[in-house]
Design a protein with these regions (language model features):
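Contiguous segments within soluble domain cores/interaction surfaces
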Residues: 1-103
Length: 103
């Protein structure tokens, strides 16, 4: 599980794989957003935030997490969900779990 320091803005790199092989480059998708929810009660912490594609790894999403947002509490765990549209498909990927700590 990734650990982020409270009071920072950091990128989480999320590698995605299409088991059918239809998608080989995330630069071709639209509607690139992610959201973060608190693991314990599923409350929304960081709503519909845009993610970008890693220029060196076209199947890796860069999700920037801002732990300065008031909902992030040191010691708590969070779930990240990624959304996008590729052709007629609109998957929801996740949860990808991470924790926020003071140090």
């Amino acid at each position: 599980m990734e650990v982020l320091k409270k009071g920072t803005t950091e990128a989480l790199l999320i590698y995605m794989r299409d088991r059918l092989g239809n998608l080989t480059d995330l630069n071709t998708v639209t509607g690139n957003t992610f959201e973060v929810r608190k693991k314990i009660d599923n409350s929304l912490i960081q709503p519909a935030t845009a993610w970008t594609v890693d220029p060196d790894w076209p199947m890796t999403a860069i999700c920037v997490i801002d732990t300065n947002i008031s909902g992030y509490v040191a010691g708590d765990e969070y779930k990240l969900y990624i959304r996008y549209t590729a052709g007629s498909e609109s998957p929801l990927r996740g949860p990808i779990e991470f924790r926020v700590e003071d140090d």
